[in-house]
Amino acid sequence: MLVARTCQLYPNAIASTLVHKFFLVFSKWEWPNPVLLKQPEECNLNLPVWDPRVNPSDRYHLMPIITPAYPQQNSTYNVSVSTRAVMVEEFKQGLAITDEILLVKAEWSKLFDAPNFFQKYKHYILLLASAPTEKQRLEWVGLVESKIRILVGSLEKNEFITLAHVNPQSFPSPSENSEKEEFRTMWVIGLVFKKMENSENLSVDLTYDIQSFTDTVYRQAINSKMFETEIKIAAMHVKRKQLHQLLPSHVLPKKKKHSVEGVKLVSLNDSSIDLSVDSDNSMSVPSPTNATRTSPLNSTGLSQGNSPATPVSLSVTNTQATDVMVPQNNSTENSGGSLNESIPETATHPAFSSTPRPLVTRVVSSMPLVNQVQKPVTNTVTKMPSPVAGVKRTSSPTNEESPKKTKTEEDENDSSNSTEVDEQNKLEPEELKEVHSEEKSSSPVPGALPSSQRSSSTDLSDISVLPATPIPVIKNSIKLRLNR
């Protein structure tokens, strides 16, 4: 319909000119003015038609493209803020490319280059639908796919998210259990986080967004008598450099292999997901947090390993600082004289401004957990790489923190449970630090605070230490911490 409207505006133009005018017109279209091929007809057949003067809900459509035949309907009913932003950006990109083509600076083949979706964003949400049989998978995938727009709308309401871009293509997903046959389908959603000024640590809680989506899908499955205990939805957060572990090889461009840990898809119905986002090159592995014990002096958000019988939560941080914000790729403005080209005036309905919806704020404290005390730990403490130097913490839960823990960022990550180990770690090589840390891990913690002064960690986005007494952890949680 957009092409037909372009042909109406330029009835005598040749094909190459129409392509250029197509991108010119709709890259500058003032949405939500509707695109109409003809004025709506009035018939007394009592069928619902798109008319914002009569239907208040039609006034909130963001990108109305109206079908010409009666009853007229909005063909882009499912367009969201993010979807419209992606399409407008592509219109501008197409305009820039066609400008180059008309100036003989590029070939027409450039207009058909594959998109760079899997290189465009730094953070992604993976949705996975699984079923025991192929027939059930087809039904289950159809239901989940029809509800993804609800998840996108929920993510857009998060005050820290600027864009949620869904890849329209679904992908097969490898099965976790080789002994049990499963049929799995996966969708990928790219995220752009808002750049916050005067904030070094940004905590984003996606628990409510993901949970409301899964509840809606399961409720619909129950109402349609499709629900069975073996059909599931899994959701997780991954970074760009982890995608090659989960997607087919032909989807991603070939590049150097990265040495990273394996990523495990965790069902939302099984455990909570606690993720720490420190840099583009870091990697977060979701794991259950119900029985995890870590070193009490670990105050940088790095969960250290313990005995093999206990689930391990890892967060590996590289030593180079990178900004985790992904600015949206702004398309190059049209070159040449396209700005001076006139667009024929057409009669359109006045723009119906969308009433802003109430913003649901879900702020999770970004204050790092420091000096959390528990009983002396006798388990093996695994040495982890030091995080980015110079990353500041906003505040500390208590005022009695030992000053030895804040000398440098490197001392903070390499410290063990005693002052003597801190002094010796500076002189020992990397391999000896790990062994020495294991020998000293059973020593009592200096400067321990009484239990009455311990801070509650239930509101922290990156829980690195659990108290001695287990606390209730909300299930189905996906929390991110972005360090500026």
Swiss-Prot record:
Q: Which reaction does it catalyse?
A: RNA(n) + ATP = RNA(n)-3'-adenine ribonucleotide + diphosphate
Q: Where is this region: Disordered?
A: 276-314, 326-356, 375-484
**Gene this chain is encoded by:** papola-b
Q: Which GO terms describe its molecular function?
A: ATP binding; poly(A) RNA polymerase activity; RNA binding
Q: Where is the composition biased (Basic and acidic residues)?
A: 423-441
Principal localization?
nucleus
What protein am I looking at? Poly(A) polymerase alpha-B
Might you name a Gene Ontology BP term for this protein? mRNA processing
Query: What's in the keyword line of the UniProt record?
Result: ATP-binding, mRNA processing, Nucleotide-binding, Nucleus, RNA-binding, Transferase
- By its UniProt entry, which SUPFAM superfamilies does this protein fall under? PAP/Archaeal CCA-adding enzyme, C-terminal domain, PAP/OAS1 substrate-binding domain
Species name: Xenopus laevis (African clawed frog)
What Pfam families does the record point to? Answer: PAP_central, PAP_RNA-bind
The family this protein is said to belong to: Belongs to the poly(A) polymerase family.
Q: Which purpose does this protein serve, as stated in its record?
A: Polymerase that creates the 3'-poly(A) tail of mRNA's. May acquire specificity through interaction with a cleavage and polyadenylation factor (CPSF).
> Which InterPro entries does this UniProt record tie to the protein?
NuclTrfase_I-like_C (IPR011068), PolA_pol_cen_dom (IPR007012), PolA_pol_RNA-bd_dom (IPR007010), PolyA_polymerase (IPR014492)
In the Enzyme Commission scheme, what number(s) does this protein have? 2.7.7.19
**Composition-biased stretches (Low complexity):** 451-464
Q: Motif Nuclear localization signal 2 in this chain: where?
A: 392-407
Q: Where in the cell is it found?
A: Nucleus
Report the superkingdom from the record.
Eukaryota
Query: Could you describe the subunit structure of this protein?
Result: Monomer.
Motif stretch (Nuclear localization signal 1):
240-257
Which cellular component appears as one GO term in the record? nucleus
